[in-house]
Amino acid sequence: SIKDNYEKVLDCKPDMIVTCAYGQFIPKEIIDYPKYGCINIHGSLLPKYRGGAPIHWAMMNGDKETGITIMKTTLKMDAGDIIKQKSTFIKEDENLETLYERLSYLGRDLLLETIPTILNQTATYTKQDENKVTFALNVTKEEMKIDFNKKVIEVYNQIRGLSPNPGAYAFLEGKRVKMYQALISEKTFKGT
């Protein structure tokens, strides 16, 4: 982990450090070292969905919009000042994998726009509104399990928000079955 090997990072004498989907806290010695700072690319429009699964939860909650935030790295999870954000809509037929891919390109492009503003010291830094903070912690195994007592749209969003990995699941005849895709039908079906 970086906590155990941060001297190796500092030996590289970085002018700037960029992280994305790192999932660990970064030691103060690393955050404070680079001349131009330590920044993070995050898969949500902060302060909404701080944490390790922002894309999953945006889809599972049925959000219509999400985006990318580039922020200063701090000792507190995803709480740094916002440097730049870009939003995008979530397509109804999209799943976690396709949205993740689109956001990765959006993040790349936003990073390429942001770095020059940091280097020439024209970047603006906006504090996050702590009253609007929500969290997107990693999805638990229990949260992956489909509850067919929920509304159809909730089950649909759960399946697409976890597809293809880690995958929503249910039990059929005592066997665990992963669901990768769902369609909402206008017809009414009887069943148990």
Model-derived features with residue positions:
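C-terminal accessory region of SF2 helicases/translocases
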Residues: N157-T192
